[in-house]
Amino acid sequence: MNEFDRVRDYLTDLQDRICAAVEAADGKARFAEDLWKREEGGGGRTRILRDGAVFEQAGIGFSDVSGTRLPPSASAHRPELAGATWRACGVSLVFHPHNPYIPTTHMNVRYFRAERDGEVVAAWFGGGFDLTPFYPFDEDVQHWHRVAQALCEPFGQERYAAHKRWCDEYFFLRHRNETRGVGGLFFDDLGQDFERDFAYQRAVGDGFLDAYIPIVQRRKDTPYGEREREFQLYRRGRYVEFNLVYDRGTLFGLQSGGRAESILMSLPPRVRWEYGFTPEPGSAEARLADYLIPRDWLG
């Protein structure tokens, strides 16, 4: 089996396993599957769970797509690849819970290959996971980062620190001067050693459930009211802002003629904006700002 097919098989299995775990955690709703084809090449399967007991919407998509010309979002930082044919596969998910005390989360793992005249000229892995709480708890954030640190350990002492820092820098809303959440891991252009890099991608993909599901179980029965729900919807607006303004995956998908429904499944089903909103000083809502700056959660 060639390298691309090995990654592809892992990713389809990962999607299956995460769907099963989320359905078990939700206890009510099930994923609906949408199989799709891309005219330019490839296709995928998008799965959406809606209106569950725990999750308002949970989307997880697998795609395997190809093209004859790299879009600007992909070739901007690799100009030598302009005009190359390409193929990419990945799994991407975003989960939006009902309960404002359960954080929203995102995970993505992907593999990209570019060819010219039948020869592979570049291939790399990318991905990571990050957590976006609305009412954060130190124990949840520390658990999230402990899992991230542990899965990085076999790949060198600096791996966690480097990819945590990359995550903090990537998921940053410059126009708001705040991070999207409390971070996690982010990596891209990892293509020096296929076996080692593929092992790391698997560690990130497999570690996601260990990082997230315990937080869901801990917070899913926390009582909340209209105030918390309104704040959750307001903060979801920042999620939308990041995805539509900064996210490279969203831009790549749209610029490459990708399937808009699948690309935009990351957006929350309900969201609101409020001009000039300022949380009451000393409130739980105001406390969130203390978490939206890069910091060492395990120190």
Swiss-Prot record:
GO terms for cellular component: cytoplasm. It comes from Xanthomonas euvesicatoria pv. vesicatoria (strain 85-10). Its EC number is 1.3.3.3. GO terms for molecular function: coproporphyrinogen oxidase activity; metal ion binding; protein homodimerization activity. Its main location: cytoplasm. Keywords: Cytoplasm, Heme biosynthesis, Metal-binding, Oxidoreductase, Porphyrin biosynthesis. Belongs to the aerobic coproporphyrinogen-III oxidase family. InterPro entries: Coprogen_oxidase_aer, Coprogen_oxidase_aer_sf, Coprogen_oxidase_CS. A divalent metal cation binds at residues 96, 106, 145, 175. Involved in the heme biosynthesis. Catalyzes the aerobic oxidative decarboxylation of propionate groups of rings A and B of coproporphyrinogen-III to yield the vinyl groups in protoporphyrinogen-IX. It is found in: Cytoplasm. Residues 239-274 are annotated as: Important for dimerization. One of its GO terms (biological process) is protoporphyrinogen IX biosynthetic process. This is Oxygen-dependent coproporphyrinogen-III oxidase. The active site is at 106 (proton donor). Its cofactor is a divalent metal cation. Homodimer. The record marks 175 as: Important for dimerization. Transmembrane segments: none annotated. NCBIfam families: PRK05330.1 (NF003727). It catalyses: coproporphyrinogen III + O2 + 2 H(+) = protoporphyrinogen IX + 2 CO2 + 2 H2O. Substrate binds at residues 92, 108-110, 257-259.
